[in-house]
Amino acid sequence: MAEEQDLSEVELSPVGSEEPRCLSPGSAPSLGPDGGGGGGGGSGLRASPGPGELGKVKKEQQDGEADDDKFPVCIREAVSQVLSGYDWTLVPMPVRVNGASKSKPHVKRPMNAFMVWAQAARRKLADQYPHLHNAELSKTLGKLWRLLNESDKRPFIEEAERLRMQHKKDHPDYKYQPRRRKNGKAAQGESECPGGEAEQGGAAAIQAHYKSAHLDHRHPGEGSPMSDGNPEHPSGQSHGPPTPPTTPKTELQSGKADPKRDGRSMGEGGKPHIDFGNVDIGEISHEVMSNMETFDVAELDQYLPPNGHPGHVGSYSAAGYGLGSALAVASGHSAWISKPPGVALPTVSPPGVDAKAQVKTETAGPQGPSHYSDQPSTSQIAYTSLSLPHYGSAFPSISRPQFDYSDHQPSGPYYGHSGQTSGLYSAFSYMGPSQRPLYTAISDPSPSGPQSHSPTHWEQPVYTTLSRP
């Protein structure tokens, strides 16, 4: 019990009070009788080594008491002479910072019963079996402690209680302050992206119909139908998840980058006006087009201008939410257009002989039959935007009242529905795949040269200039 008391006092004594006693000038063996704490500290306390010089001093002290025959006498005397001539008060003490008090040395907690047992047993075992690894020794000591019964533990418990009372006397204002664990987890308070980011033209405020479409405006004009009035591809989409473009641009020919149409103005009610003029239709992924059945007409009608003149509607609403024919080509099926019930579909069967189908699209607007932006008829294919109310698809066509639809329409039937019963917008439908071949070769009725019927080999198409109303 006396040995345990000595050990515990050494463990409890603060570093400041321990060092001058251990490092007093003189030979190392003279440190032993200098109090119980010093003797205990010198007898092999391996658990708390100091910095380099202090460790040497403790080692010398340990050698002086325990194994005198390890070093010759001349070596021990030389070491003692060197150590006695050095002022050890100049050596900075190892101070563990406790809170903000950097000047005061760290006060250790009083040992509990297991610590009393483990320290005494560790010293005894380390002297007897120096080859034992410290970690294995600790494990074994813990196992042995759990196997002890209450009568075996009682002396250690009493000693721990005595140490606790002594610690309370020595440090009356002591308060246990455990070191705060550094929180390695990343801060989770990262702010979510705002609903309509202007840089991406996002429309997350428009709820699940758009599935928070983040359409990149940082690549404008790459085959864009509305950026500089070149509707090379039918205009963009109405919604889609923020996936990167996966469809290869097979129909892209010569899109000029013209970032003068930046649709970054937020609409009223927190719903941004998405300018899809800078969105290439060929970049829409397959999942977007296969999930287009959940389509709310009332959400989209707010973007239409009040007048039904398709010259304006084609330039605005077709740019706002258009579904082009290349969209269904990329999708591969026509299941993404759902037919709303109770809407009359004026089906215009193509008149004409030997594959010259001229589909005439009529508009019952308040101004009468609307006049699309006419332009001089040339031998190349020109395009205007036939504005559908829901999908606003800018179908490539000849810009005349009689529209010759070119030969790259997809096989799926198109249903363009009038969302309002007043019939402000044009409504038309194509024949199903059972009524017409996959690609109908349509030639321009005007005198023209030979045209190629592949959309990747158009020769210098003539474009209608589309402008905002």
UniProtKB/Swiss-Prot annotation:
It is a peripheral membrane protein. Residues 163-176, 257-274 have a biased composition (Basic and acidic residues). Gene3D superfamilies: High mobility group box domain. The keyword DNA-binding applies. Keywords: Activator, Cytoplasm, DNA-binding, Membrane, Mitochondrion, Mitochondrion outer membrane, Nucleus, Phosphoprotein, Transcription, Transcription regulation. It is found in: Cytoplasm; Nucleus; Mitochondrion outer membrane. GO terms for molecular function: DNA binding; DNA-binding transcription activator activity; DNA-binding transcription factor activity; DNA-binding transcription factor activity, RNA polymerase II-specific; RNA polymerase II cis-regulatory region sequence-specific DNA binding; transcription cis-regulatory region binding. Residues 65-105 are annotated as: Dimerization (DIM). Residues 107-175 bind DNA. The modification Phosphoserine is found at S24. One of its GO terms (cellular component) is nucleus. Residues 33-44 have a biased composition (Gly residues). Residues 443-469 have a biased composition (Polar residues). Residues 1-70, 163-203, 215-278, 357-378, 436-469 are annotated as: Disordered. Coiled coil: none annotated. Residues 231-313 are annotated as: Transactivation domain (TAM). GO terms for biological process: central nervous system myelination; enteric nervous system development; morphogenesis of an epithelium; negative regulation of transcription by RNA polymerase II; neural crest cell migration; oligodendrocyte development; oligodendrocyte differentiation; peripheral nervous system development. Residues 23-32 have a biased composition (Low complexity). Residues 356-469 are annotated as: Transactivation domain (TAC). Pfam families: HMG_box (PF00505), Sox_N (PF12444). Monomer. Interacts with ARMCX3 at the mitochondrial outer membrane surface. Interacts with PAX3. The transactivation domains TAM and TAC (for transactivation domain in the middle and at the C-terminus, respectively) are required to contact transcriptional coactivators and basal transcriptional machinery components and thereby induce gene transactivation. Transcription factor that plays a central role in developing and mature glia. Specifically activates expression of myelin genes, during oligodendrocyte (OL) maturation, such as DUSP15 and MYRF, thereby playing a central role in oligodendrocyte maturation and CNS myelination. Once induced, MYRF cooperates with SOX10 to implement the myelination program. Transcriptional activator of MITF, acting synergistically with PAX3. Transcriptional activator of MBP, via binding to the gene promoter. This is Transcription factor SOX-10. It comes from Sus scrofa. The lineage of its organism: Eukaryota, Metazoa, Chordata, Craniata, Vertebrata. The gene is SOX10.
